[in-house]
Amino acid sequence: MISEENFQQHTPMMQQYLKLKAENPDILLFYRMGDFYELFYDDAKKAAALLDISLTKRGQSAGQPIPMAGMPYHAVEGYLAKLVQLGESVAICEQIGDPSTSKGPVERQIVRIVTPGTVSDEALLPERQDNLIAAVYQEKEKFGLATLDMTSGRFQLCEPADKETLRAELQRIVPVELLYCEEFNEMAAIEHCKGLRRRPIWEFELSTAITLLNRQFGTKDLRAFGVEKSPLGLSAAGCLLQYAKETQRTALPHIQSISLIQNQDCIQLDAATRRNLELTQNLSGGTENTLASVLDKCVTPMGSRLLKRWIHQPIRDVEKLKQRQQAIAEILNFDLVDELQPYLQLVGDMERILARVALRSARPRDLTRLRTALEQIPALRTIVQQKTSPFLTALFSQIADFSEQWDLLQRALIETPPLLIRDGGVIAEGYHAELDEWRMLSDGATQYLENLEKRERESTGIDTLKIGFNAVHGYYIQISQGQAHKAPIHYVRRQTLKNAERYIIPELKEYEDKVLKSKGAALALEKQLYDELFDLLLPHLGSLQLASLALSELDVLVNLAECADTLNYVMPTFCDEVSVKIENGRHPVVEQVLKDPFIANPVELNHNRHLLIITGPNMGGKSTYMRQTALITLLAYIGSFVPADSARIGPIDRIFTRIGASDDLASGRSTFMVEMTEMANILHQATEQSLVLIDEIGRGTSTYDGLSLAWACAEWLAKKIRSLTLFATHYFELTALPEQLEGIANIHLDALEHNNSIAFMHAVQDGAASKSYGLAVAALAGVPQSVIKLAKQKLTQLEKNSSYSAEQQIQALREANHNQGELLFEQETDALREAIEKLDPDDLSPKQALAYLYQLKKMVG
């Protein structure tokens, strides 16, 4: 920015600025000057453009005008919020020296760095979603990933086995900042993330990470946290902790532990599945009409955030799920929703308030909200313990007795304090005797000045005489110009106005010094007492955090009970058999947005019926049917009740979806390539305990290619993997699969045509659909009737002239599959050679030979 040789040409103030800017060259520097934060040079130009503030000049330095922009210090939070939302980071530089005693520029220091992932101020945070920062480390083909929520202290790590798993984890946590090593070589896996920050390799050094983590937690080793055998995750965690300390410039006592996320403990959802199921974000990027938008009526922001974490990370611990179900049932049975929610609402965002207490950045109203939260605990405890069985009572065993902390805050703080401690008026009367004495001296000024004014009027005979005060000249005696000649000789003129003269007398000056001293002493003491409140609260931080987590969970359970009651959900049951059986299931989101009654449908998947071929018209409800099956399963595995008449669900390890696709222009991938990539991931990762949803595979290529791929994928899933699969297709030929393989069945969603119109029945029935209704759907979409008429003529002609009928295509695929000797499932490396060796051209018709040639061609390229 500024060359070294020109540095000495700058003013002392600008030299100080340039030194501080050099410490953080890549981020904006807010430089405190009196009552303003100012930015200079390129920072000023950038801030002016981003914040829509004026770009001006501040004199000259080194012979050049200095570009400058700024904002009042009291308005800085709004500007910071906008910059953070834009993904910018800001270094906050404050005056820490005393201007009255400083020689040269006042001493300044960067006191904190505000970044999107490390903010804790209420105004800068999205209230009902987590604000996470993450770090990723790579060693060969394996990864370490660590996440930190600065607003709660939640610190976690995991070790994704491959880049697909890494991508899925990043899709789950959606970090606002992602730190990555300078030697990271899988940028395609992280390039979609916000706030990418490249960090030096030494920040990921394992031994340094272990030392830093032990120092943070006050431990000798990390075995108590169960992370000691996760070196890649620890390397990422070490970088993350260094970054947090670097930006906060203070201790981080609310980060008290770290935990390992075990994939086997949760149902795995890949990135495509999270997107397709629209859990917390719809396909357009918004939050309307998502699962979370239907379920989330939590009365606390921290409960809302916890619910979204549950949705994105369903657990497989059936005993824990049953405990959640039991708690929801108890809340319903005792009609506790209306009784508990008013108290929970007053608890507020206790979790984030505690983080600000830990960082010593909590404002007076944070502490009064904490006081209010603590005040609700006894009433909540009484309700829960008197009316419910052991699970909710056990939840409250995590909540200690905070009567002493409540009493402290009750005595220390006034009822409704100002926003900031800066101007005082926060500490309550009676809390500290010395503070009360200084305040009495200061507050007694009004009576003293009234008495002095009355006395001086009487002694001088000047009826226009009055005593006033301003910040520049202090106290003064003011006399109108018409009576100024009557001023006594001991009145010393202080200021001349157009219509009056202002004077000072020794007695008033002496009193002014005394009052100003008392105000200054009172403010300094009040700030000291406010800081001491943090010292008194911090020893209890760990137990307070446990309480906030328990109250968050209670809020979620009460919320799910309310949903079950108002939305007519039922408690699902779990079984040991790998299966899903749902009676009259409903899509939890679609049923809320439909004006007409939702048509409920059953689904049954088990060992003998593990793949359902679903046919029917477009818009008939195939995708809705598949999605509702996945969402009902997911809801069961967060412990919620589900939208159905009944549900019985066995062990599920993963949920996969291949529903819909569009071009991935950023990565240069076509619709078909995106489709095949998602399908390949399913074929590699799915197991017998996976729930797989496949919708219209193979439509992005030619008919024969698409049919062959769809057939092969369905056969692989049914015969090799044996996962629980819903397989929707527009290839009617696939309805012959149940005749060939065990465990496959046909179902369809029907429609009725009448007088060139179509009515979708949305009801699932056994068997294959009789037709596709494609032309009827096209007419419904508004395609001109002349085009529909021409299409009907072409359809009749094609059906009449087709020499390669659907039956023949199916037979060719069957025979080709047989003659290949189960080529699809062959594990040998030289599969192509073996396939050709087994081929007997004399046994093939010309049509069969052509189909076989297509398959051989695909094998080589």
Swiss-Prot record:
The keyword DNA damage applies. Gene3D superfamilies: 1.10.1420.10, 6.10.140.430, DNA repair protein MutS, domain I, MutS, connector domain, P-loop containing nucleotide triphosphate hydrolases. One of its GO terms (biological process) is mismatch repair. One of its GO terms (molecular function) is mismatched DNA binding. Keywords: ATP-binding, DNA damage, DNA repair, DNA-binding, Nucleotide-binding. InterPro entries: DNA_mismatch_repair_MutS, DNA_mismatch_repair_MutS-lik_N, DNA_mismatch_repair_MutS/MSH, DNA_mismatch_repair_MutS_C, DNA_mismatch_repair_MutS_clamp, DNA_mismatch_repair_MutS_core, DNA_mismatch_repair_MutS_N, DNA_mismatch_repair_MutS_sf. One of its GO terms (cellular component) is cytosol. Transmembrane segments: none annotated. ATP binds at residues 616-623. HAMAP family: MutS. Belongs to the DNA mismatch repair MutS family. This protein is involved in the repair of mismatches in DNA. It is possible that it carries out the mismatch recognition step. This protein has a weak ATPase activity. This is DNA mismatch repair protein MutS. It comes from Haemophilus influenzae (strain 86-028NP).
